[in-house]
C-alpha cells in the first residue's frame, strides 16, 4: 500500500484567532477544531495541572487572567522598550518582563514561575492548528505556509518563522495576509481579464492594505501599506475604558486594578461590539462585576462609532498611500475586497465606500477564512500540486519598507526601494571615509526617512582586514538580497582581497539563536507529553467514577435487588463509598492510582456478578471492563466538565 501523499497546510496565525486550511482534490477545505469551530482563539493558558490552547484557554480566561496569554502577535519580533509594547502592557492581565531587551511573558505553571518568548506562545497556537489538521487528514502534517501582516518588518517575519520551527513545522514560505486573501478572491475568477484589486484587511490586531493586479493566475502586488498595531482589540479597549468610567461614575468604584473584573468586562465588550455590527444597540449584563455590584448598561452604535471615530478614520490613510505608491487613481480599482472580522463594522464599510465614491464593496469571500484559504493554495503550489486550478499560479509580492545602510553623516542610503517586487537582489559599491581605514562598519536600516536615526536599525556587522589605502580607494561591494519570505541577507565584499562578510538580518540580535530554537522544540515536545499525560489522568479518573456509579446503579436495579446476598451488597456498597471518599480527596492523583482503585473495586465486584450470572457478565450484558472504558477518550466523548 502506498504512503499517503504529503500535504502542506496554510495557517493564518492571527492576533486574536487563527485558522487552518488544506488544498486537496482541487479545492480548499477550512478545517474545524475539536470544538467544531473553524477559527481557534490564539490563546494559551497555564494552570496548576495543565496547559490549555485555543477555545479551552479563552473560556477560562476570567478565572485565571494572570496566566492566560493572548496577543503574542503584538509582541513577536519587537523589543521590550518598543512604545507599542509598553502601551499594550497596560491592557494585559498577564505579566511581561524584559530579558536581554526582548519581551517574555511570565506565568505560573504547575506551581512554578515560568517565562516564555512570544515565539514560544505562538508556536503553541501553531501546534494546535497542526493537530487540528492532523486529526482531519489522518496523517502527520510537516509542511506549512504561514501568513503575516504585509507590514510586518524583517524581525517579525523571522520570529514567526522560528515559531513554526518550534512547533515542528517546516515553514515553506511566509506570505503576506492580504496577498493570501487576494488568492482566495482571484482563484475562481480566472477568465475576467486583468483587474486591479484593493484588499482592505482589518483584523483583530493588525491592519493592511494591498493593491494588486490579477491576470490569468498571476497575482502581482503593486503596493502595500498598513499599521501593524490597529485592529478589533483597539476598538474593544475603547469600549472597556468607556464602561470603566461609567462604572466609576455610577457606583463610585474603580475596577481598573481587578484583572478578573476587567476580563469579564472585556469579554462583554467584545460581544457588544459584534452585536453592534447587526443592531443599533447592545446591552451588557454582568452579574457581580466588582465588589458585589451588578453592572447592567447599554450602548448605541452611534456612541461606539464616536468612541472609535479617530481609529476608524485612520484606516483611510494607508489606502491613500497604497494607491499613491501603486500609481493608480481610485477610479482605476475594479474591486475593493474586505478581509478580517473588523470589516464587518458598518462605519468602517461606510467610510471606505464613501472614499471610493459610493462604489459597492466586495464581500464575496469569508473575511475570517480568506487568508488561511489563500495560504492553503500557496502551500499546494509550493508542494508541486498538479491540479490545473493552481498549476500556473504565480505570486509576485513586494518588500513593505525601503532597505538601506548608513553612510557618512548618518544618511540613509537606500538599496531596495519599498514596494520592490521580491525576491530581489541589489548591489552597490561603497568606499572608505578616512585614510588607511582597516575596516568598515555596516549598519542596515529599514524605513522611509532621510536620516538613519529616524529609521529602524535591523542589524550591524563589520568587514575588517581592508589593506591600508588612501580614503576613497578601497571598493566595498554591498549586496542586499531579499528572499521570497521577505527576509533579508546582506553581504559585503572587499574587491581587492575578495574577503567577504555576511549577515542574515537579526534585528539587533533580536532573533533566537539556532540553539535556542532547538531547545524550545525540545521543550514543546515535553509540554505536549505533559498535556497527554494530563489527558490520560483525567480519562482514568472519569473511568473510575463511571465504574463506581455503574456498580451503585446496578445495586439499585429492581431485577437484581433480591438476587444479591445482603453481605455481598454491603461489601460492594462499602467499597463504592470508600472509593468515592478517596476520589473526593485525590482529585489530582496519578493515572496509576486511579487504575489501582478501579482494579480493587473490580476484584470485589467481579466474583459477585460472576456468581450471579454464572459467567463474567454484569447487568446489561457488558463486562465491568467495558463499562469502565466508557471514560476512555478513544471510545467516546467524555461529557463531564473537569475543572
UniProtKB/Swiss-Prot annotation:
Residues 396-511 are annotated as: Substrate-binding domain (SBD). Keywords: ATP-binding, Methylation, Nucleotide-binding, Stress response. The modification N6,N6,N6-trimethyllysine is found at residue 563. Residues 616-643 are annotated as: Disordered. One of its GO terms (molecular function) is protein folding chaperone. Induction: Only at higher temperatures, and no basal expression. GO terms for cellular component: blood microparticle; centriole; cytoplasm; cytosol; extracellular exosome; extracellular region; ficolin-1-rich granule lumen; nucleus. Residues 3-388 are annotated as: Nucleotide-binding domain (NBD). It holds the Pfam family HSP70. ATP binds at residues 14-17, 73, 204-206, 270-277, 341-344. It comes from the Eukaryota. Molecular chaperone implicated in a wide variety of cellular processes, including protection of the proteome from stress, folding and transport of newly synthesized polypeptides, activation of proteolysis of misfolded proteins and the formation and dissociation of protein complexes. Plays a pivotal role in the protein quality control system, ensuring the correct folding of proteins, the re-folding of misfolded proteins and controlling the targeting of proteins for subsequent degradation. This is achieved through cycles of ATP binding, ATP hydrolysis and ADP release, mediated by co-chaperones. Belongs to the heat shock protein 70 family. NCBIfam families: PRK00290.1. This is Heat shock 70 kDa protein 6. It comes from Homo sapiens. The lineage of its organism: Eukaryota, Metazoa, Chordata, Craniata, Vertebrata.
Amino acid at each position: 500500500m502506498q504512503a499517503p501523499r504529503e500535504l502542506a497546510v496554510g495557517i493564518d496565525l492571527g492576533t486574536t484567532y487563527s485558522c487552518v486550511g488544506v488544498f486537496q482534490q482541487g479545492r480548499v477545505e477550512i478545517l474545524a477544531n475539536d470544538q467544531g469551530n473553524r477559527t481557534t482563539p490564539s490563546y494559551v493558558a497555564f494552570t496548576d495541572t495543565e496547559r490549555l490552547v485555543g477555545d479551552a484557554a479563552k473560556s477560562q480566561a476570567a478565572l485565571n487572567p494572570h496566566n492566560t496569554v493572548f496577543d503574542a502577535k503584538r509582541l513577536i519580533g519587537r523589543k521590550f522598550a518598543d512604545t507599542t509594547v509598553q502601551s499594550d502592557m497596560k491592557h494585559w492581565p498577564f505579566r511581561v518582563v524584559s530579558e536581554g531587551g526582548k519581551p517574555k511573558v511570565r506565568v505560573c505553571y504547575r506551581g512554578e514561575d515560568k517565562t516564555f518568548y512570544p515565539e514560544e506562545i505562538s508556536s503553541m497556537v501553531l501546534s494546535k492548528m497542526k493537530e487540528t489538521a492532523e486529526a482531519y487528514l489522518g496523517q502527520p502534517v510537516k509542511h506549512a505556509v504561514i501568513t503575516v501582516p504585509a507590514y510586518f518588518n524583517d524581525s517579525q517575519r523571522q520570529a514567526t518563522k522560528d515559531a513554526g520551527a518550534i512547533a515542528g513545522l517546516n515553514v515553506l514560505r511566509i506570505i503576506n495576509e492580504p496577498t493570501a486573501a487576494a488568492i482566495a478572491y482571484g482563484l475562481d475568477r480566472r477568465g475576467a481579464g486583468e483587474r486591479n484589486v484593493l484588499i482592505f484587511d482589518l483584523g483583530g490586531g493588525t491592519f493592511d492594505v494591498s493593491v494588486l493586479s490579477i491576470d490569468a493566475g498571476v497575482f502581482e502586488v503593486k503596493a502595500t501599506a498598513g499599521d501593524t498595531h490597529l485592529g478589533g482589540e483597539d476598538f474593544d479597549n475603547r469600549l472597556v475604558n468607556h464602561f470603566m468610567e461609567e462604572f466609576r461614575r455610577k457606583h463610585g468604584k474603580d475596577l481598573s486594578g481587578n484583572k478578573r473584573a476587567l476580563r469579564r468586562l472585556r469579554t462583554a465588550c467584545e460581544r457588544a461590539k459584534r452585536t453592534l455590527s447587526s443592531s443599533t444597540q447592545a446591552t451588557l449584563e454582568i452579574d457581580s462585576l466588582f465588589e458585589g455590584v451588578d453592572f447592567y448598561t447599554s450602548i448605541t452604535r452611534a456612541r461606539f462609532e464616536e468612541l472609535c471615530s479617530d481609529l476608524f478614520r485612520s484606516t483611510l490613510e494607508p489606502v491613500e498611500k497604497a494607491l499613491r505608491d501603486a500609481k493608480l487613481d481610485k477610479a482605476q480599482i475594479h474591486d475593493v475586497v474586505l478581509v478580517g472580522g473588523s470589516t464587518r463594522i458598518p462605519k468602517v464599510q461606510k467610510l471606505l465606500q464613501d472614499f471610493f465614491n459610493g462604489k459597492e464593496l466586495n464581500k464575496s469571500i469569508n473575511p475570517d477564512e480568506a487568508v488561511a484559504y489563500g495560504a492553503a493554495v500557496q502551500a499546494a503550489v509550493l508542494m508541486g500540486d498538479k491540479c490545473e486550478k493552481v498549476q500556473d499560479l504565480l505570486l509576485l509580492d513586494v518588500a513593505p519598507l525601503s532597505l538601506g545602510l548608513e553612510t557618512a553623516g548618518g544618511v540613509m542610503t537606500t538599496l531596495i526601494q519599498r514596494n520592490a517586487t521580491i525576491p530581489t537582489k541589489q548591489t552597490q559599491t561603497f568606499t572608505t571615509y578616512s585614510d588607511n581605514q582597516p575596516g568598515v562598519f555596516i549598519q542596515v536600516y529599514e524605513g522611509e526617512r532621510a536620516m538613519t536615526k529616524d529609521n529602524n536599525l535591523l542589524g550591524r556587522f563589520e568587514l575588517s582586514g581592508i589593506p591600508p589605502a588612501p580614503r576613497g580607494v578601497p571598493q566595498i561591494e554591498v549586496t542586499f538580497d531579499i528572499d521570497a519570505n521577505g527576509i533579508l541577507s546582506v553581504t559585503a565584499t572587499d574587491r581587492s582581497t575578495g574577503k567577504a562578510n555576511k549577515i542574515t538580518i537579526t534585528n539587533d540580535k533580536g532573533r533566537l539563536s539556532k540553539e535556542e530554537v532547538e531547545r524550545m522544540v525540545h521543550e514543546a515536545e515535553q509540554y505536549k507529553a505533559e498535556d497527554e499525560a494530563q489527558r490520560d489522568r483525567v480519562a482514568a479518573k472519569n473511568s473510575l467514577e463511571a465504574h463506581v456509579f455503574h456498580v451503585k446503579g446496578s445495586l439499585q436495579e429492581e431485577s437484581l435487588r433480591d438476587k444479591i446476598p445482603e453481605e455481598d451488597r454491603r461489601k460492594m456498597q462499602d467499597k463504592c463509598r470508600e472509593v468515592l471518599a478517596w476520589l473526593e480527596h485525590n482529585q489530582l492523583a496519578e493515572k496509576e492510582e486511579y487504575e489501582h482503585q478501579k482494579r480493587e473495586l473490580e476484584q470485589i465486584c467481579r466474583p459477585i456478578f460472576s456468581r450471579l450470572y454464572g459467567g463474567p457478565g454484569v447487568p446489561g450484558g457488558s463486562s465491568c471492563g467495558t463499562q469502565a472504558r466508557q471514560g476512555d477518550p478513544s471510545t467516546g466523548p467524555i461529557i463531564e466538565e473537569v475543572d
